[in-house]
Amino acid sequence: MIFIFISLFAKIFFNYNDFFTNSHVKIMAKSLLNYQFHQVKQTINTPVLIFIHGLFGDMDNLGVIARAFSEHYSILRIDLRNHGHSFHSEKMNYQLMAEDVIAVIRHLNLSKVILIGHSMGGKTAMKITALCPELVEKLIVIDMSPMPYEGFGHKDVFNGLFAVKNAKPENRQQAKPILKQEINDEDVVQFMLKSFDVNSADCFRFNLTALFNNYANIMDWEKVRVFTPTLFIKGGNSSYIKIENSEKILEQFPNATAFTINGSGHWVHAEKPDFVIRAIKRFLNKN
C-alpha cells in the first residue's frame, strides 16, 4: 500500500519507524484573531511560520512544534474564531477562517509565510493558500485531506461537552467524570478539559454552540487548485488521509509530497513530536 501511495504522489513518501495580497481577494474580517508573534532577527527573505490549531483547540496545541523552530524563524500562533481567546461568531466556514488569518498577516505586514495547520487548521491553511498563493511559500498540513468528511464523527465529544454545559461544574475535577460518561478516550477528555472555563456560559473557552451549529461546514470542503509546495503529514493509524484519495489530493495540490509516521493517530504532533519536527525540517530545507 505504501508503494501505491508513492506512485500516485509521484514523489517520495517518507516512512519513519524510528528516529503563514492577492489584490482581487477582498478580506471581510472585522475583528483580529487573538495571536502571539515571536519575532527573531532574520533576513528579509525568511518567511514567518504560522501555526494553526484544529477543532476544539487553541494556539498552544502546536506549541512544542513551534518552539523547535523559534530560534531560526519568527513564529505566529493564532486562536481561530470561536476558539481560545479569539472572538466568537455564529458564522464559521473555511472562507471566513481563512480571511481571519489573512487579516492578521496583513496587520503584521508579513510578505511571505509558511503555513502549518493540523486537522481543521490544515483545511484553513489550504484555503488561505488557495486565496492568497503569493503569500504562502510552503504549506504543511498535518493529518487532514482536502476532502469533505461525511457523518457526525464527534457525536460523543459534543454529547460530553453539552453534558458539562448543562451540569455547570465548578472546576475541571467536577467536569472530568461528566465528560467520561460520553467520551471513552482519556486523551480526548484531557484535551477538552484544557479549554474548561468556569466563567464561560458554555463552560469552555471555545464557542460550543457555534461549533455544533457549524459542524457541517467544518467537515465540508470545496475543491481548490494550489501549486504551492505542500507537505501532507499522516498519522499512520489515522484515517483522515486515505491512500485511495491520493489522486484527488494531487488534483488539488499537484506539488504535494506525503510523509507518514507509523504508530501515531490523528494527534500525531502530540504523540510523536520529534518525528513531525524532523519531517517539517526536511521539507523546509528542500529547495
From Swiss-Prot:
Pfam families: Abhydrolase_1. Keywords: Hydrolase, Serine esterase. It is an enzyme of class 3 (hydrolase). It comes from the Bacteria. One of its GO terms (molecular function) is carboxylic ester hydrolase activity. Residues 47-273 form the AB hydrolase-1 domain. The active site is at 119, 266. Transmembrane segments: none annotated. InterPro entries: AB_hydrolase_1, AB_hydrolase_fold. Its EC number is 3.1.-.-. Disulfide bonds: none annotated. Belongs to the DmpD/TodF/XylF esterase family. PANTHER family: PROTEIN ABHD11. This is Putative esterase/lipase HI_0193. It comes from Haemophilus influenzae (strain ATCC 51907 / DSM 11121 / KW20 / Rd).
